Amino acid sequence: MIVIIDYDTGNTKSISKALDFIGLQNKISSDATEISQADGVILPGVGAYPEAMKELTRRGLNKTLKEIAAGGKPILGVCLGMQLLLESSNEHSFTNGLGLIPGHVEKLPEDPEFAVPHMGWNQLQIKRATPLTKQLDGEYVYYVHSYYANCPEEYIIATSGYSIEVPGMINKGNIYGAQFHPEKSGQIGLEILKGFKEVTYSCKSSQQ
């Protein structure tokens, strides 16, 4: 069972429909106990970093996510959810994040040739093969964001070219993040979610 975290800051239903489509049993929940019992967790997110982090903390889900990460279960952060996995953000004001992957969230640089937000389809360049990125080099995914993950290169598994080389996907151990929206990226997005399904089942088998 995959639990999609509901903290009033994410596109939970569209992610749930995508998981239904690939046959991955899932549930939308804000209950810490249900989330802790999941085989894997997806942290969605749209909106502003400070408000999202505040809401996670208010519900005690920041601690829940850290416990899940420490226990080795897979976590996938999507869009703002990916950014929350990092150590901090300077969106509006400095805000501490979950600190599950080293890095800091910064605004995309101003450039007359590149609009902010970065919105629309862009091509992936795979930097490191994982179950989520295999055979996806050169494929297109759908982005909507104004901020990006500035993190060490060793954690960046896919990028897209824009005003800078945007980290499209990041990974550290059992923690994954996608800056783009897999649930809005057609068949390629579904392949990425299938990769998360593979990681989840593999992790579950190894823990039994």
UniProtKB/Swiss-Prot annotation:
Domain Glutamine amidotransferase type-1: 1-206
Keywords: Amino-acid biosynthesis, Cytoplasm, Glutamine amidotransferase, Histidine biosynthesis, Hydrolase, Lyase
Subcellular location: Cytoplasm
Keyword Hydrolase among record annotations: yes
Pathway(s) the chain acts in: Amino-acid biosynthesis; L-histidine biosynthesis; L-histidine from 5-phospho-alpha-D-ribose 1-diphosphate: step 5/9
Quaternary state and interactors: Heterodimer of HisH and HisF.
HAMAP family on file: HisH
Protein name, entry field: Imidazole glycerol phosphate synthase subunit HisH
Encoding gene, per UniProt annotation: hisH
